């Protein structure tokens, strides 16, 4: 019995060893290689299906039917662009630049005693304005603005009343007044600055053009370009062709007492010789003959007296005699 039981237990063990595991069997049935990892990979959904499930690019709302591109209100129907005035509107109504600014300044100008008169005829003069506006009150003066280049009227001017109330009354009653066939317009001056009859004139310091050389002035004072000074020809630097500051003619006599190129000198006689008032003879003239030169000349004279000039004597002895002498 014991032997039979051992044999039966051995048979069961052998059966267990020989029987394949269920996992490997399934793997062999599915893959044929016994690889369980590939089985799990095959069970995952394929990549191709995931790509097909993603929406195509052609139907993207941001690409094809994007409202920002095709129907963007900022492009086609932008209220900022569509509502801006077009060129036709500018031609029809104007750009509203200087005219609007001028009218706004004129309308906001505070009442004053200066009344501007605009739209005048070219032949209207200052006396005509004074005669026309003097019926409203006393007038200080009238300025008719003239063109500086042509000298003609610019067709507007300013009437200066002594009282501001008279200017206010004249403005109210003289609107659309006919003067020399022109309908004039009156308004208060928009500026407090005085109005000049010829605008454009420069009242400041003189400015020199870089293309022109500045005026030449003497570094020592007055004087024009050709030497005449502020005091009758003796300005700073003196006359260019006459007397200088030291008081003498440049080519004539000197104030120091003598001619520059000859004559006597206050410092002691003739410059080129003669006696010196400071102490007798200066020792000779200025061109080389002083006391030392005189000593050399005396020595040479004594040498000639003793023996003569040997070279001159030999030359006299060797001279050929006259062949024609008999």
Swiss-Prot record:
Composition-biased stretches (Polar residues): 104-113
Top-rank lineage group of the source organism: Eukaryota
Localization (cell): Nucleus
Compositionally biased spans, kind Gly residues: 220-239
Biased composition (Basic and acidic residues): 38-55, 240-326
Example GO biological process: mRNA splicing, via spliceosome
UniProt region (Disordered), positions on chain: 1-114, 179-326
RRM domain mapped to chain residues: 113-191
A single Gene Ontology CC term: cytoplasm
Function: Sequence-specific RNA-binding protein which participates in the control of pre-mRNA splicing.
Protein name per its UniProtKB record: Transformer-2 protein homolog
GN (gene name): tra2
């Amino acid at each position: 019995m014991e032997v039979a039981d051992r044999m039966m237990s051995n048979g069961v063990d052998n059966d267990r060893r020989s029987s394949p595991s269920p996992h490997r069997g399934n793997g062999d049935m599915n893959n044929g290689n016994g690889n369980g990892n590939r089985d799990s990979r095959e069970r995952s959904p394929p990549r191709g299906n995931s790509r097909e499930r993603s929406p195509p690019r052609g139907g993207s709302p941001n690409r094809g039917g994007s409202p920002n591109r095709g129907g963007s209100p900022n492009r086609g129907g932008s209220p900022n662009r569509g509502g801006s005035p077009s060129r036709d509107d500018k031609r029809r109504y104007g750009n509203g630049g200087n005219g609007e600014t001028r009218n706004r300044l004129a309308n906001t100008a505070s009442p004053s005693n200066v009344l501007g008169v605009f739209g005048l005829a070219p032949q209207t003069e200052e006396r005509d304005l004074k005669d026309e506006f003097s019926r409203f009150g006393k007038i200080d003066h009238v300025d008719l603005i003239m063109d500086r280049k042509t000298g003609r009227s610019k067709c507007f001017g300013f009437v200066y009343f002594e009282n501001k109330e008279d200017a206010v009354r004249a403005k109210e009653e003289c609107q659309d007044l006919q003067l020399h066939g022109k309908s004039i317009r009156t308004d208060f001056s928009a500026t407090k600055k005085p109005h000049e009859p010829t605008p454009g004139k420069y009242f400041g310091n003189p400015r020199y053009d870089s293309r022109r050389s500045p005026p030449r002035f003497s570094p020592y004072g007055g004087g024009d370009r050709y030497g005449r000074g502020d005091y009758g020809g003796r300005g700073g630097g003196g006359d260019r062709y006459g007397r200088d500051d030291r008081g003498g003619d440049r080519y004539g006599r000197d104030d120091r007492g003598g001619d520059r190129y000859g004559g006597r000198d206050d410092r002691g006689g003739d410059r080129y010789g003669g006696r010196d008032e400071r102490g007798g003879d200066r020792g000779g003239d200025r061109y080389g003959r002083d006391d030392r030169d005189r000593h050399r000349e005396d020595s040479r004279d004594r040498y000639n007296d003793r023996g003569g000039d040997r070279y001159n004597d030999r030359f006299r002895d060797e001279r050929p005699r006259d062949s024609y002498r008999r």
